[in-house]
């Protein structure tokens, strides 16, 4: 069964909107902020893979693999910073990161 490209784009748009809402509503909680960013990146990957399947080219799939690699690096660094902040300040509030500048 082949899924129409329009349905893939609609799903990608809904996922992106859901991630954007997550980022905007819970922007002070760093863990929810990371989850929202991940959902938005997954929506972009879905659109790339859907476009690659639609036009029969592998460029979108290759770009999705690159996004996955960058996302894993981003998550590992951000999670390390969140763990550090939680150990030091006992909170995951984004305002606490501003005090660590220096």
Swiss-Prot record:
Location relative to the cell: Cell inner membrane
Biological process, per Gene Ontology: ATP synthesis coupled electron transport
| Main enzyme class | translocase
Regions that span the bilayer: 5-25, 30-50, 65-85
List the coiled-coil residues. none
Keyword list, A-Z: Cell inner membrane, Cell membrane, Membrane, NAD, Quinone, Translocase, Transmembrane, Transmembrane helix, Transport, Ubiquinone
Reported function:
NDH-1 shuttles electrons from NADH, via FMN and iron-sulfur (Fe-S) centers, to quinones in the respiratory chain. The immediate electron acceptor for the enzyme in this species is believed to be ubiquinone. Couples the redox reaction to proton translocation (for every two electrons transferred, four hydrogen ions are translocated across the cytoplasmic membrane), and thus conserves the redox energy in a proton gradient.
By sequence similarity, the record places it as follows: Belongs to the complex I subunit 4L family.
Q: How does it assemble?
A: NDH-1 is composed of 14 different subunits. Subunits NuoA, H, J, K, L, M, N constitute the membrane sector of the complex.
Q: What is this protein called?
A: NADH-quinone oxidoreductase subunit K 2
